[in-house]
Amino acid sequence: MTVVPGDHLLEPEAAGGGGGDPPQGGCGSGGGGGGCDRYEPLPPALPAAGEQDCCGERVVINISGLRFETQLKTLCQFPETLLGDPKRRMRYFDPLRNEYFFDRNRPSFDAILYYYQSGGRIRRPVNVPIDIFSEEIRFYQLGEEAMEKFREDEGFLREEERPLPRRDFQRQVWLLFEYPESSGPARGIAIVSVLVILISIVIFCLETLPEFRDEKDYPASPSQDVFEAANNSTSGAPSGASSFSDPFFVVETLCIIWFSFELLVRFFACPSKATFSRNIMNLIDIVAIIPYFITLGTELAERQGNGQQAMSLAILRVIRLVRVFRIFKLSRHSKGLQILGQTLKASMRELGLLIFFLFIGVILFSSAVYFAEADDPSSGFNSIPDAFWWAVVTMTTVGYGDMHPVTIGGKIVGSLCAIAGVLTIALPVPVIVSNFNYFYHRETEGEEQAQYMHVGSCQHLSSSAEELRKARSNSTLSKSEYMVIEEGGMNHSAFPQTPFKTGNSTATCTTNNNPNSCVNIKKIFTDV
């Protein structure tokens, strides 16, 4: 189809100087034999300005050597995408071959093209990894809605928005304590916090050694708790008199001061107090410092002679155990632990099924081994509940050996139990690994990037109308694309030109103040 400019359309000329429609039924005899040559039919009306790019013409898309063909109106359903916007896709056009060339993943484009053909349905091909397909969605600029649909179809959780405080000072403080990568001081605060956590964990472990436990009056057994409590209450010597001068207590106090300061600062600087209070990591921070204040209150009460030490030591033994949860504070500064937590959270359904299958297997095989071993007096399976431990150890392939079947029937049941355990545990593993890979690439995609550039096709383009007409005569570029260029889509005044050499000749490329606009830049996110 030839595009005829509007100012060159032929107007009908009426015979004898009069205007009107040509005679119906052919040229009249009275008008002369040349009457038919004076009238030419008008060409079809050109599309409106908003419909120029959505004609029914076909377009060829070359993906790393594999050619796809579709209609322009199919691509124009999504004008905000790379293929749907003529200005965006023009830089990838090769007028010599009359096609768009993309050096991208070929299997992924089947799903990308189906997205346009189906009106917005996105489906990942089974032979394309999740991280590669998500990169293709970003490259073709399908938008956040398509990305959310893709993640939802893959079974991933929606990413939670993390707003920042509105006030400048509050935002700076929040960034310092919540985002270690935001600045150097924030990284320094994170390092100090990690060191304090490690010191607290080391102190928690060292104070249980026998030599240090004696100094701190740390009983080795519950009976010794009561015995020493009775002696102290009889003699009237307060057990907490020397606790405040103990080195472990001093170091613990310094650690708690830092934990409390960090928690309070983050609480007052957070953008939402309600969200802060519901965060599991903040709850762990609170649980990590509560045992210290309970212990301190108990020590002060005993020092004044108002406490019941026999009861307090038993309670404090449990309270001190809670201090071990401080190790989870490291997950705030470790992306690996965060990824593991997100993976477990996203895989709760699979983990629930695993526990359910294990529960069924434990009941089944513990009952079977009990009845198989019931006739042997030397068997250790005295009841079905006693066999629960053996079934769990066998299905998880641990095999402590403290309980084992001795009869032929019991050994057969044990073999089946081990095989069933291997199959049960192996079933949800691929799903959990897939979730881990997704969260790992999502967390690390901004850290390690490698860029490579390949030559685009914009050296073939020129803003000169004369060169466009020459290219039109040598290729079959669709009229829609030329209309876009001629009407200012690639205007010379809006996009300055930069010459560059290709072989022995010099080509011209529009740069839009960006030296990389003439090449297709792809970011590959790698993991370490």
Swiss-Prot record:
| Source species, domain of life | Eukaryota
Q: Where is this region: Interaction with KCNE4?
A: 435-528
Example GO molecular function: voltage-gated potassium channel activity
Q: How does it sit in the membrane?
A: Multi-pass membrane protein
Q: How is it modified after translation?
A: N-glycosylation promotes the cell surface expression. Phosphorylation on Tyr-452 inhibits its channel activity.
Q: For the region Disordered, what residue ranges are annotated?
A: 1-32
Q: Which residues carry this modification: Phosphotyrosine?
A: Y452
Q: How is its activity regulated?
A: Activity is up-regulated by JAK2.
Renumbered to this chain, the positions carrying a covalent lipid of the kind S-palmitoyl cysteine are C270
Assigned keywords, A-Z: Cell membrane, Glycoprotein, Ion channel, Ion transport, Lipoprotein, Membrane, Palmitate, Phosphoprotein, Potassium, Potassium channel, Potassium transport, Transmembrane, Transmembrane helix, Transport, Voltage-gated channel
Subcellular localization? Cell membrane
Tell me which Gene Ontology terms the entry assigns under biological process: protein homooligomerization
Q: What are the inducing conditions? A: Up-regulated by lipopolysaccharide and down-regulated by dexamethasone.
Q: Which residues lie on this side of the membrane: Extracellular?
A: 207-247, 302-315, 371-411
Q: Which reaction does it catalyse?
A: K(+)(in) = K(+)(out)
Please report, in chain numbering, the residue ranges of the motif PDZ-binding: 526-528
Q: Coiled-coil stretches, from where to where?
A: none
Stretches in topological domain Cytoplasmic: 1-187, 270-280, 335-350, 435-528
Family membership, please give it. Belongs to the potassium channel family. A (Shaker) (TC 1.A.1.2) subfamily. Kv1.3/KCNA3 sub-subfamily.
Report the domain remarks: The N-terminus may be important in determining the rate of inactivation of the channel while the tail may play a role in modulation of channel activity and/or targeting of the channel to specific subcellular compartments.
User: What is this protein's record name?
Assistant: Potassium voltage-gated channel subfamily A member 3
Q: Which gene encodes it?
A: Kcna3
